[in-house]
Amino acid sequence: MELIKEETAPEDDSRGRQRDCRTSVVSSKQVQRNQLEICPGLVSGDVHPMCRDRSDPEPRTGDAASDDGFPADKTSSKRDSECAAVNTDGVSDGRQGKKKHRRRPSKKKRRWKPYFKLTWEEKKELDERETARASRVRAEMFAKGLPVAPYNTTQFLMEEHDREEPDLNTELGGRKSGAIRSEDTASEDENFEAEEDDEEEGGGGSDGMGRPGQAGGEFLQKDFSETYEKYHVEALQNMSKQELVREYLELEKCMSRLEEENNWLRHVRRNPESPADGTGSQRVRELEVEVEKLRAENNELLLKTPASNEPGLNQSQPS
C-alpha cells in the first residue's frame, strides 16, 4: 500500500526510495519468471498449464481468468501443447541417453539337423569328422603325457556281420573274399576255440544281465539283426531306380544258381552210388585216360606193320 501511495503522490525527497522499490519489484518478477520456466513436467512427466518458453511474453492481469477454471485462450493452449511436446522429448532423451541396441539374428546360421534325418552320405561325413576330431584329441592328450583310451566305435560289428553275409557277386566275390579272409582265418579260429573252451569250463556263463549265455546271445543276435535290417532299408531307399533294378537282377541270378546247387546236393544225397558223386567221376576220368592210351598204342602198331596183303589188327578181312 505504501508503494501505491508513493507512486500516486511522489515527493522530491523520496525519489531514491521509489527507484529502489521499482528495482525490487522487477527482481521479484524475474525470479517468478524463472520459477515458471522450470516446468514440473520434467520431473513428473505431466503437462503443467503454467509451463511456457522464455520467448513468451509475461501474462497480463486480465489473462489470469484462465487459472481460475475458465477456458483459456487459444494462444495459451498452443503454448501448453508445445511445452508438453518439448518436455516429453527431453524426458526420452534424458532417460535413454543413447540409441538402444536391438539384437538381430546372426547371419551365420548353424544348419543343424538331427542324426536320424541325415542321409547316408551326411552320416558318413559326420562320422569321419568325429573320428578325425577324436584322433586329434587323443594325440594331444598323449603328447601331454595323459592316459588315453581307445576311440569307441561300433564299426567292427558291421565288419564282422558283413563277413558272415554271402557275397552276391559270385564270379568276382569268391576271389576277393578268399584273399581278404585268408589273413584273418587263423586268428579267428584260435579265438573261437578259446571261447568254446571257456564256455565249456564255465558251464555256459551268462551275458552279464542275469540271463544264461545262450539266451543273451539270442537277444543280442536279434537286436543286431533288427539294426542291420534298418540300415539295409535305409540304403535301399537312398538308391536310384536303375540301381534297384540292377540289384534285383543280380539277386535273381544268385537265387537261380543257389537253387541249382541245392537240387544237385539233394540228388547226390538220395543216390549216393550214382556217378554224380566224387568217386564215380574219378573212375570215369581213369577209364578215359586208359582209352586214350590204347588208341595211341594202336596207332603205333599200325605204323610199324609193313604194307602187305595180310590184314592187320584193325583191318577188316575181305568178305
Swiss-Prot record:
Compositional bias ranges of the Gly residues kind: 203-216
A cellular-component GO term for this protein: cytoplasm
Biased composition (Polar residues): 24-35, 306-319
Annotated spans, Disordered: 1-111, 157-223, 262-286, 299-319
Source organism of this protein record: Danio rerio (Zebrafish)
Stated role: Transcriptional regulator which functions as a general RNA polymerase II transcription inhibitor. Core component of the 7SK RNP complex: in cooperation with 7SK snRNA sequesters P-TEFb in a large inactive 7SK snRNP complex preventing RNA polymerase II phosphorylation and subsequent transcriptional elongation. Plays a role in the regulation of DNA virus-mediated innate immune response by assembling into the HDP-RNP complex, a complex that serves as a platform for IRF3 phosphorylation and subsequent innate immune response activation through the cGAS-STING pathway.
Signal peptide range: none
Protein name according to UniProt: Protein HEXIM1
Coiled-coil zones: 240-306
Primary localisation category: nucleus
Subunit description: Homooligomer and heterooligomer. Core component of the 7SK RNP complex.
Family assignment from sequence similarity: Belongs to the HEXIM family.
One matching Pfam family: HEXIM
